[in-house]
Amino acid sequence: MSDKIAAIATGRARTGIGILRLSGDGCIEAAGQVFRLNSGRPLSSLPDRKLSLGTLFDAQGRPVDHCMAFISRAPHSYTGEDTAEIQCHGSPAALTAGLEALFAAGFRQARPGEFTRRAFLNGQMDLTQAEAVIDLIDAETADAAANAAGQVAGAIRKKIDPIYDGWVDLCAHFHAVLDYPDEDIDPFTLSGYEASLTESSRQLTALLSSCRRGRMVQSGIRAVILGSPNAGKSSLLNRLSGFDRVIVTDIPGTTRDTVEQTVTLGRHLVRLVDTAGIRDTQDVIEKIGVDRSMEAAKDCDAALFVVDASKSLTDEDRRAMGAALEAPEAIAILNKQDLPGAIEPSDLPFAYIVPISCKDSTGFDLLEQAFDMLFPDNAPCDGSLLTNARQAGAILRAKKSVDSAVQSLRAGMTPDAVLVDLEAAMDALGEVTGRTMREDITNRIFERFCVGK
């Protein structure tokens, strides 16, 4: 038996529609004390998932809104329990009055993520699907939303479950060989088991290989802006942000620390990192900023090397250029195209060179095209991209353990030694979907949800 929970699923801000969400044993009958159908029939008489008109009452029995409601009976609901939703006008006062009436009718306030936690505990979804719900809510691009939607539908589970189930079969055979040595059981075939485990390791490697793109789709491409002082780095950040995110002056060394801003560039979510101008300086604070600029260049997906194209290259420009070229991807940005040029594109050893003017905003379409070429949309965002660090960590541990099992087989070790590694791999892989559940992990996951989800 589960107690009855209720929450405002749409928050308490003024909106066109506000939703009261309910779940738990007996919640449909109890909700009928607060929401009464216009037909006069009890709420429990409705068929599942049919919106019907009625009136919402407060705890004193006064009508507070004319709205709609529907019910879903267990197990065919989001949580796997009896559920109901009351869809009101988005008045914070009406929603609060309705929620207080529900409390008086025996409901309690739902905790953050409790609806989805119940869905997980009742077998309506696994942990990858639960985490994808958060990713879908947080998605800032169409690609991120599409990938999260695919994972809500079970894309990761469909890749993980066959591997896990295959390991279960292998473990069962190993145990049979060990526990019943005198029985007529298929012999321990070294080559067959090795091939099976090697193939599962390959599949895990393929899944892990999607992590980089998955992270960029979900969290954004980390692009570090590098250049000498007054090249136009902060002006570039401000132009792409659409507002004055950082201070811009003619004084060298104005930017002394890294400044981050997330922007949308075409179909790409980009986390821009503005940095201090790279130069030799005696100023202690500015020197720390320059050091951080060099460190940021080592931890990025792309470097944007900004240079004042109206002046010849300086030693400071070349130092910044060297740092940019060490990044996984790099774009040279010839700024100040509104002035006579002093640098030819052929002077720069970059595959992608974009002439722009931060003053009049010319050339920014070319920058978007450069990102399209560097980060092509050549892999489907259907849920197959691994975006979650927790899941990736568990898969990596599983792969290391299964690789160790393969090495044990090749070394001619006995089945019991192989079992140790294989069962460790199963424990790790089971954490991905929740088949091997740790309460501290699930608590951490569902604490990320808002109330009402």
Per-region residue spans from a language model:
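C-terminal-of-GTPase-core extension/linker across diverse P-loop GTPases
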Residues: 3-8, 12, 142-264, 281-283, ...
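Short alpha-helix of the ABC ATPase nucleotide-binding domain corresponding to the H-loop/switch region
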Residues: 278, 286-290, 318
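Switch I (G2) and immediately adjacent beta-strands of P-loop GTPase domains
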Residues: 52-64, 69-73, 253-281, 299
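Inter-motif core of Ras-like GTPase G domains
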Residues: 286-310
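Conserved catalytic network of the ASCE P-loop NTPase/AAA+ motor domain
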Residues: 12, 62, 76, 126, ...
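A glycine-rich (often HGG/GG-containing) alpha/beta subdomain
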Residues: 1-146, 150, 154, 331
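Generic enzyme active-site microenvironment
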Residues: 272, 306, 333
